[in-house]
Amino acid sequence: MNKQNIGFIGCGNLALQAIKTLSGSYNIFYSNLSINQAAENLAAEKLETIDLAKKCDVIFITVKPNVTAEVLSSIASQLQNQLVISFVAGISRSKLVDLAGGYKNIVRTMPSLGIGFKNGPIAIAEMGDKALVDQTEVIISELGSTYVLEEKDIDAFTAIYGAGPAYFALVAETMSKLAADSGLSLPDKDLASV
């Protein structure tokens, strides 16, 4: 059986974790947009964004919201039957479709930082095309636990599962710094970060 070609446009931390996990099951490609230098050492091939859109069966959009319009408009002419999976926070599916020139095979998802451990929750926005949602779920279930939610609930999911871990990491980091600044020994400082 031939492996599907999966491409990532943008390669920040979430994309990097997804690439690491999915590279055993799929042929992975990534564009040179927002490349995390660690991606250079992965089992993935670097392509120009337009070439990635032509070659891949599934395209992950993993860029910051402020460049999403530019990315989708740049690949819109290449989209035919590909599944486009968005990891972009705060942009609705209808807006993504508009930015892609009306292309409808787009599924909005929101992963959490736990995808690096294959156990984080991942939200998938419910939509009219169950087959696209099912196809998305098959792929991203390798990254964590999937939950199909009404799209109106995706932003709340993002706030809780996206910002929540970052908040607690900041608290732990602050506690560690306070411990070190107070002259606690390394083991005591480590206890403060637990």
Region locations from a protein language model:
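NAD(P)+-binding Rossmann beta1-loop-alpha1 motif at the extreme N-terminus of oxidoreductases
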Residues: 1-53, 119, 178-181
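Non-catalytic terminal and connector segments of soluble metabolic enzymes
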Residues: 9, 17, 47, 54-55, ...
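Residues forming the Rossmann-fold NAD(P)(H) cofactor-binding site
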Residues: 16, 69, 93
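Rossmann-like NAD(P)-binding element
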Residues: 50-79
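Short, conserved loop/helix-junction motifs that constitute active-site signature segments
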Residues: 75-81, 99-102
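ADP-ribose/adenylate-binding Rossmann-like module
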Residues: 79-92
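Internal alpha-helical scaffold of NAD(P)-dependent oxidoreductase catalytic cores
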Residues: 95-105, 121-157, 167-194
